[in-house]
From Swiss-Prot:
Residues 812-831 are annotated as: Interaction with calmodulin and ITPR3. Changing M680A: Impairs Ca(2+) permeation. Disruption phenotype: Knockout mice display impairment of the intercellular junction-dependent barrier function in the skin. Increased energy expenditure and improved insulin sensitivity in white adipose tissues is also observed. They also display reduced Ca2+ entry and loss of regulatory volume decrease in response to hypotonicity in acinar cells. The voluntary water intake normally induced by sodium concentration increase in body fluid is impaired. N-glycosylated. It catalyses: Ca(2+)(in) = Ca(2+)(out). Residues 1-68, 110-143, 850-871 are annotated as: Disordered. Non-selective calcium permeant cation channel involved in osmotic sensitivity and mechanosensitivity. Activation by exposure to hypotonicity within the physiological range exhibits an outward rectification. Also activated by heat, low pH, citrate and phorbol esters. Increase of intracellular Ca(2+) potentiates currents. Channel activity seems to be regulated by a calmodulin-dependent mechanism with a negative feedback mechanism. Acts as a regulator of intracellular Ca(2+) in synoviocytes. This is Transient receptor potential cation channel subfamily V member 4.
Amino acid sequence: MADPGDGPRAAPGEVAEPPGDESGTSGGEAFPLSSLANLFEGEEGSSSLSPVDASRPAGPGDGRPNLRMKFQGAFRKGVPNPIDLLESTLYESSVVPGPKKAPMDSLFDYGTYRHHPSDNKRWRRKVVEKQPQSPKAPAPQPPPILKVFNRPILFDIVSRGSTADLDGLLSFLLTHKKRLTDEEFREPSTGKTCLPKALLNLSNGRNDTIPVLLDIAERTGNMREFINSPFRDIYYRGQTSLHIAIERRCKHYVELLVAQGADVHAQARGRFFQPKDEGGYFYFGELPLSLAACTNQPHIVNYLTENPHKKADMRRQDSRGNTVLHALVAIADNTRENTKFVTKMYDLLLLKCSRLFPDSNLETVLNNDGLSPLMMAAKTGKIGVFQHIIRREVTDEDTRHLSRKFKDWAYGPVYSSLYDLSSLDTCGEEVSVLEILVYNSKIENRHEMLAVEPINELLRDKWRKFGAVSFYINVVSYLCAMVIFTLTAYYQPLEGTPPYPYRTTVDYLRLAGEVITLFTGVLFFFTSIKDLFTKKCPGVNSLFVDGSFQLLYFIYSVLVVVSAALYLAGIEAYLAVMVFALVLGWMNALYFTRGLKLTGTYSIMIQKILFKDLFRFLLVYLLFMIGYASALVTLLNPCTNMKVCDEDQSNCTVPTYPACRDSETFSAFLLDLFKLTIGMGDLEMLSSAKYPVVFILLLVTYIILTFVLLLNMLIALMGETVGQVSKESKHIWKLQWATTILDIERSFPVFLRKAFRSGEMVTVGKSSDGTPDRRWCFRVDEVNWSHWNQNLGIINEDPGKSEIYQYYGFSHTVGRLRRDRWSSVVPRVVELNKNSSADEVVVPLDNLGNPNCDGHQQGYAPKWRTDDAPL
């Protein structure tokens, strides 16, 4: 007998309808455990099936053993309503491929399932007996329904930005003691959590689920871990939500993340964030501050460096040792728009660092390669940034120590500028920018960078001080050495074996010539090794083009030393080695044609034709010769050992090439083919061919391909090379001329380098600590007819050179220097045109002259000495 307080029991022949169905059963009734127990009645025996169940065909959802296992698991896990477990199994269906997300959204496609409560509802029905309901029993309250969340559901919700679907997420996490950073909520391929997913799916710069996710993370106690959770795959390793917010240009989310404890020094080191030459796509310096700077977001840069929560340290370096200034140089591409924003951002960061860290100069920090931002710009050929750095002029007195260009005096359109030579010309103490420009052949536009002031005038000054005299002394010395070598080789004895005796005056003169030749060979050997190693040629192309003469001098010295060793050993083969050294020595005299523009351009043409056009021609021609020689020799009749005699049997000989084919025929035939190419050969071998027609046909095709085709192609290519060199002869010769100057300077000892150093020591202002700012500067007198005394921070109010000089240490032994007037003349900032747009930066890339203070190109000569002026 049933207890009146029990819930209603269904009769065996009735069907229990689920809540919310059209049966009219109240949706507020609880699911009776007795009905759940009756669901599995008669499962082991088929005799208890009702007629309704027996007549209904079995469907795919009637797997009773699986259903029993799911409900038993529900009881073990403590699910309040087992029907919820049935609904949760709907998310385990096959995943529909979603649209691709790139970049950084996902490396792989994952499925997205959107569940609608009215779709695909399936209810298990059980026939139970009808029992009258007790009108006195109150309906029990249903237990709360707990939503189930997993990665596909959560990622789909945040992608749509639906905050309503996140209801119940906090309860689910707290009930099951889970966190949003658990592995089950991460993308397996990248380790991405739902926060980066939400930031990558913004609508009009917003995603309303982001504050909700941060609130949930705070309540679950892992806010910092959730915000700073990085990507873990090799492609995007190290990237955090802060990087994504900056890349999406969302300052409000950047502020929100930083306020919640985001790491402002997180480093994104994945393959995607490497330079292009290393297989990456966008290198920005790994740090969030560098990313904001490289994407031209000054408002985010200001916030990261000045926020009250955690300030980004601008002095921080990435895994390559690069600062944010290095990163800006790395992304420069010499276009006008790119150069404009890079230079403005560069100055913003440099000035900001000076104000925040007065004792630090961000521009002097070296990376792992030992390069400052200026050196990096020179090495990578970023001419726009390079020109901006070396010509930077700051008129603000508080940050004037960051200037590299100072106006000493101005009078009308004429003004004298002082350029800071630190890092530009280091006088051998460390690697200088000038050496990087001259000896780094990977820069295609280095001849343009050498035309930027003050580099151009600095080279002219070096040539006037020591380059010209040293160069002509070297020319005379080398020619004398080669004349002595030639006379020594010409008057070698014809009889006897080496070493030859020295008896007469001529013999002693020959001995003196041999000693001088050996001495020059040893000298060239060590100097060539020094030049080849100290220049650090970056590749084979640099070695054979820029270092071609150093390589030829090295080979010449080796031949001279080997020839001397063979001579002393008594081997007559020394003569063969000596003649090669003699030829190569006279060819090396072309090196000294660099001193003159006319002959210097000619030597450059010869180098390019030898290493470019002629090399390719010889490669193809050699293949043709080997192929045709192999085929034609095969057609010749082999030689026999039978002797061929005259009619009187007096002269008997064994037949050889060209009468037949023997062991030496192939090499001799190669020489005959070369003679045919230049029109000097004959066809004596035709008589010994097995098939003369085939032989002649092959010879005709060979002559057409080599004499007609290849030779004319070589002539055309050489003409094109000569034309290209002629168009850029001036710039190319200047590069060779600069190389000659630096070669001479590097051959000097350190004390001579300092003695001939260009520039003067001047006091240009005050440093950050208030002490006099003394620098080694180079003076360039310039003229500007478009703007007159605009925004010029001048040092001296009296124009022209002073007649009073001071001496500073070692410099007084070289020459008198310009008087330091800082103690008597207070620097003034003359601002006569406050409406000039000083912020506009326009870098002329075609004609690299001196821009005026507004950045516009001048129509007149930017300096006193023009490029066409004689040296």
